[in-house]
Amino acid sequence: YLNRTVQAADLLAEVGADNAFIQYDIYHAQRMEGELAATIEKYLPRIGHIQLADNPGRNEPGTGEIHYPFLFAHLDRIGYQGWIGCEYKPATTTEAGLGWRQSLVR
């Protein structure tokens, strides 16, 4: 198992495939290593997909300790161009669990 981003980056370097990227799971990264913004920035060229879930609880963004408004602004600032997907359990209903998206409307 890979428990840290550096392990995934080292594996990609060893394989040498330019078309393979890290799927950065924010929930697990926060649990295992923290420092989300710094880690994403450091490994930005190797990250191709980011999964969203808050911590603790693996619920939707805004229900835990991760400051998603800062993190989304940081992704914009550093020029992240990859995919972002959601992999969380809604704290209540699916409809209510999608409410966090309204904070992204500019």
Locate each region found by the language model:
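Histidine-acidic metal/acid-base catalytic patches
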Residues: 2-24, 28-106
